[in-house]
């Protein structure tokens, strides 16, 4: 998967189109990412189940995963770009911006 944890991404499709955020977690098996402040849902939590920082029960607002095809990585110039790969001089695989050719 070309989007990793810590990447800055732009949402290109869906209700949160145009929103920018940092990737909190990536789930390669399901091809989904968790983006900070994007795709927020309300979850009803029981009183006895402390989950994701909620000591008492009630309604908790949290991020839900979004499909990786609905986001684009933001490069060093601040523009959304597609991601490519190349091998550096040591033979290590690095991600490259398709827009400007710089390393991500």
UniProtKB/Swiss-Prot annotation:
The keyword rRNA-binding applies. Keywords: Ribonucleoprotein, Ribosomal protein, RNA-binding, rRNA-binding. GO terms for molecular function: rRNA binding; structural constituent of ribosome. It holds the Pfam family KOW. GO terms for biological process: translation. One of its GO terms (cellular component) is ribosome. One of two assembly initiator proteins, it binds directly to the 5'-end of the 23S rRNA, where it nucleates assembly of the 50S subunit. One of the proteins that surrounds the polypeptide exit tunnel on the outside of the subunit. This is Large ribosomal subunit protein uL24. The lineage of its organism: Bacteria, Bacillati, Actinomycetota, Actinomycetes, Mycobacteriales. The gene is rplX.
């Amino acid at each position: 998967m070309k989007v990793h944890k810590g990447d800055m991404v732009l949402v290109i499709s869906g209700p949160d189109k145009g929103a920018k955020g940092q990737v909190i977690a990536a789930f390669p098996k399901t091809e989904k990412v968790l983006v900070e402040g994007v795709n927020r849902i309300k979850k009803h939590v029981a009183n006895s189940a402390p989950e994701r920082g909620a000591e008492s029960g009630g309604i908790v607002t949290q991020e839900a995963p979004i499909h990786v095809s609905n986001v684009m990585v933001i490069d060093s110039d601040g523009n959304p770009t597609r991601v490519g790969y190349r091998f550096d001089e040591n033979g290590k695989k690095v991600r490259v911006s398709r827009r400007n050719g710089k390393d991500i």
